[in-house]
Regions:
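N-terminal flexible segment immediately upstream of the FAD-binding catalytic core
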Residues: 1-92, 109-138, 289-298, 339-363, ...
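C-terminal substrate-recognition/cap domain of FAD-linked oxidoreductases
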Residues: 8-9, 46-65, 249, 255-263, ...
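Alpha-helix capping/hinge segments and adjacent helical runs
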Residues: 40, 44, 48, 441-453, ...
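Short, ordered loop/turn segments at secondary-structure junctions
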Residues: 105-108, 169, 286-289, 452
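Activity-critical C-terminal alpha-helical subdomain
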Residues: 210, 454-503
């Protein structure tokens, strides 16, 4: 699938006119004069179908709501700016009228971050798209935030021989702004880094409509990094209106390898030693016994490790040699590289999510980052915790991203609720998430590696960050005193009232 537009997660079980809101929040109706002023600034729409479409993302729980003729919360109006000036004017107008704003791009997030909890204005950023300029000497790309992954990469590769190297599972249906807002990671991150490492600078519209540039230099020491402040802020501190990304020459060569280990711990040790020796292949993915059997050639007792690197031949040879040495030293057997080919061909497939949801199963994923010394404990503890929940049918994991000091563990779980009612589904979903996230935090993992917080994880963030969350909340209040930017997210208390769910 290659698209350059948002892709709906799942169909509704009823006509759009019959859809109701799951979240019940109180907001004042938008006045006719406000809507008229908005339409003067840029194209806007309060068409019902438009409002429903732009108020969704890929949060798995919300898919069950869709199958029960509900959406999370509809926006009141959709705006489609095409310039920074448009965004600035929209924000200033909303600030003066205390109207909440939620930014929308590809709407591929899985935690509900793009859902407008308090209605108001949704700004559709997908008309603000395209590569503006490329500094080929420095490898610096100026791009608009509504640009979809395929459009960015195709432009850079075909016209400039460059690649950003950011390939998340949502690559085909997500945008540059979304990558930054959620602090995402691509599947080649062990070589190229997370989106944090790729962003050189940002243009940001603040909550009063003013516009700032955070800088585009390769490094700096003029106080804390303002660029970093907005990466991962999920549209709650400012609206990203322009981006400068670091790009690399297209890799001239590629190499692949696959291994099977008799134990997850042996494979983790091989990965750790390879990474700490300086080997950073673009892809280094380890699957536990269950996931290896399901999709990667294992027999139920083996763990598959898939390796792919790209770049100059001399560098690839060195990287792959280090990885091979550590794998063999830790009791691995070499496998057919066709396993890597299979993964490459199916890595972005999400069809199982929709299929199982339609059958009434609860299915979701949870990713956390953890130091090497705790990887095995976190992996085992979280899976065991999930399986203690009533109705849990499967808990598995893989390591998807690696660093000098640790890795990302990506869990997948499936549960069968006690009945196919929405109430039973929600009880099952919440129970598994509580078990999984709390056990991860208990054993030393963080809250999230790259999916972000949104609505789903908001209840855990204060525990995860501790007093540091108060600092984050103080920044939010300083930048957005009227609480208009994506209110109710990142665990921030909203001045707009209580968030209730329809029963």
């Amino acid at each position: 699938m290659t698209t350059t537009h948002p892709t709906p997660p799942i169909e509704f079980s009823a006509d759009i006119s019959q859809i109701t809101d799951r979240f019940q929040t109180t907001t004042k109706p938008l006045s006719e004069s406000f809507l008229a002023d908005l339409n003067i600034i840029c194209q806007s729409s309060n068409d019902l179908a438009d409002r429903v479409k732009h108020s969704r993302d890929w949060w798995p729980l919300a898919m069950h709501w869709s199958l029960n003729a509900q959406t999370a919360r509809r926006a009141d109006v959709i705006c489609r700016p095409t310039t920074t000036k448009h965004i600035s004017d929209i924000v200033a107008l909303c600030s003066n009228n205390s109207v909440p704003i939620t930014v929308s791009g590809g709407r591929s997030g899985v935690c509900g971050a793009a859902i407008p909890l308090f209605g108001g204005v949704v700004i559709d950023m997908t008309s603000l798209a395209g590569v503006i300029s490329v500094d080929e000497i420095s490898g610096l790309v100026e791009v608009l935030p509504g640009t979809f992954g395929p459009d960015l990469e195709n432009d850079l590769r075909e016209k400039h021989g460059l690649s950003v190297g950011h390939f998340p599972q949502s690559f085909d249906i997500s945008t540059v702004g979304g990558w930054i807002g959620s602090r995402g990671a691509g599947q080649f991150s062990t070589r190229y880094g997370k989106i944090d490492d790729m962003v050189a600078g940002l243009e940001v519209v603040l909550a009063d409509g003013s516009v700032i540039l955070t800088g585009t230099e390769p490094a700096g020491a003029a106080g804390p990094s303002l660029t970093s402040l907005f990466i991962g802020s999920e549209g709650s501190l400012g609206i990203i209106s322009k981006v400068w990304l670091r790009a690399h020459p297209i890799a001239p060569a590629e190499r692949r390898a696959a291994y099977m280990f008799g134990s997850f711990a042996d494979a983790v040790e091989a990965m750790r030693l390879a990474i700490r020796s300086g080997a950073t292949p673009a892809v280094l993915r380890l699957y536990d016994e269950r996931e290896s059997k399901r999709a990667h050639g294992g027999d139920g007792t083996q763990c598959a490790l898939l390796v792919l690197d790209e770049g100059e031949n001399i560098l690839i040879d060195a990287m792959m040699k280090v990885v091979d040495n550590e794998c063999i030293a830790n009791n691995a057997q070499s496998e057919d590289v066709a396993l890597v080919e299979h993964w490459m061909n199916h890595r972005n497939d999400t069809s199982g999510l929709q299929a199982l949801s339609k059958k009434g199963f609860v299915i979701d994923t949870m990713e956390v980052a953890v130091c090497w010394s705790k990887v095995n404990q976190v992996a085992e503890t979280v899976k065991k915790s999930i399986m203690t929940v009533t109705g849990a049918r499967s808990a598995s994991c893989h390591i998807s991203h690696s660093y000098i000091d640790g890795a990302c563990i990506y869990f997948t779980f499936v549960a069968e609720p006690t009945s196919n009612t929405l109430e039973a589904i929600e009880i099952s979903y919440e129970a598994i998430w509580n078990a999984a996230q709390n056990s991860a935090l208990d054993t030393g993992a963080n809250l999230s590696h790259h999916h972000g917080v949104g609505i789903n994880r908001a209840k855990f963030i204060k525990r995860a960050l501790g007093p540091a969350h108060d600092v984050l909340a103080a920044i939010k209040h300083a930048l957005d005193p009227n609480d208009i930017l994506n209110p109710g997210k990142l665990g921030f208390a909203s001045s707009r009232g209580e968030i209730k769910t329809k029963k």
